[in-house]
Amino acid sequence: MLDVFRKPNGPNYTWATDWASQLLALTRGEVLHRVDGSFFNAPATPRESIEAQIYGKSLFGPGTPIYVGTQNFCTLGVAGYDEAGNTIGVTAGHCGAIGDEVYSADSWENGVTGTVVAKSAPTGTGAQGAFGDVAIIKFDDTKAAVTRTYNGVTVAGLGTTPQGLEGLGTNLCKMGVATGLTCGPRMYSTPQLTMAHVCSMQGDSGAPLLAGDRLVGIVSGGVTDLAPCRSPLQGPLFVPVLATTTDSIFAQLDAAEAGTPGRGFRLPDADEPRLR
């Protein structure tokens, strides 16, 4: 019986059943490959994205895979609205340049649905490179819908809390197109930067870093380019991930001039998207 909510092969979307793919992904049956060099069973396009396409929309939320410009494949950290009512997304700054067109890799058939309108570039490599590694995307309201829950990942709050979610050793999780949902302990933290032993690789840039259902960071990359997390067979043998803290991102946006895209960012309502 045809499953209308199972997308067939397409751009960065290849199903495999060979024994090597199953072994490297530690997955029986079909394995989805989405990023070159990743042997994980990648996150499949979720039902809610396909339903949004029925209404002519691309759906964006935490963990949505995105194309930025002509070459970059990244992950969206969060989507919502700014104080001017613009529909906004946040990803890693190194994913693209101002003016780059953006579209969802889960609904690539819909074409361009947003544009990078602001960014702060990385200032170096490794830990230095994560500072300010943020890009702001403005979506076309006629083509895009946003949600706080996407593919099983929910962002219900922004930034750290008095309850101590920001403490060292706190379990943090990220959702990226290359390696999916992976978790590990926070290892180091400053007001601008968080380092955690969480599996990630190229393609996961921009992904949400979560403490429970609170967004605490936007993934920038690994501490070094050595030993990225390419297969679950690696176990804990991969470099830690660096993320720009949500607190620093939104503090910077809120301090910007009125009218700056992203200023006064808020999450979508819990019942969004309202497609009908």
Where is each model-derived feature located?
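Polar low-complexity intrinsically disordered regions enriched in Ser/Thr and small residues
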Residues: Y13, L32, F40, L59, ...
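Serine endopeptidase catalytic core focused on the charge-relay Asp
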Residues: V68-T190, A211-G212, L275
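Protease-domain processing segments flanking chymotrypsin-fold serine proteases, especially trypsin-like
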Residues: M1-T87, D100-T115, L267-R276
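C-terminal cap/linker of serine protease catalytic domains
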Residues: V112-V116, T123-G126, F139-G157, G221-R276
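A short local loop/turn or secondary-structure capping micro-motif enriched for an aromatic residue
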Residues: A97-D100, D204-S205, T224-A227
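FAD-site-proximal beta/loop scaffold in flavoenzymes
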Residues: M195
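Catalytic nucleophile loop of clan PA
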Residues: C199-V219, V223
